[in-house]
Amino acid sequence: MLRAALTIVFLFAGFATCHAGDAKKGEDVAIEHCRRCHVIPGQNNMGIGISPSIKAMIQSKATDWRHKFEVFYALRPHPSFVIIREFRTRPEFPLGITPVIIAVDDLDHLMAYVDLLAQELRK
């Protein structure tokens, strides 16, 4: 219930769209947390299963590709293992999945990194 409420607040209050992040710190966040499932340009060549690469998501023809990055923590499967530190949301973890615990600032840094990659990849 709390997770759903936070998701709604973040989505409709514009939380995810006010970026003042550091792209290098965002790359570090992606390397630490995202590459276990997704391919990060210049970092790893393999992700898991059907997890799309960061490059493929950025180069997507979908018009909402950036919004999906902004709210990734609310999109499946992320709510089952991503915790926003400041809000201490604690999802029910499936067996064998280590939680990803990130700070609100990490979200801004991650978006700065995505925006930097997009400048190159979406030319």
Tell me what each language-model feature is.
Residues 4-14:
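Bacterial N-terminal signal peptides
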Residues 27, 42-72:
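Gly/Gly-Pro-rich "capping" loops immediately C-terminal to redox-active cysteine motifs
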Residues 30-41, 110:
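The canonical Cys-X-X-Cys-His
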Residues 37-38, 77, 118:
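Protein kinase-like catalytic domain
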Residues 65-80, 85:
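Long, charge-enriched, surface-exposed interaction segments in small proteins/subunits
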Residues 87-123:
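C-terminal capping alpha-helices of c-type cytochrome domains
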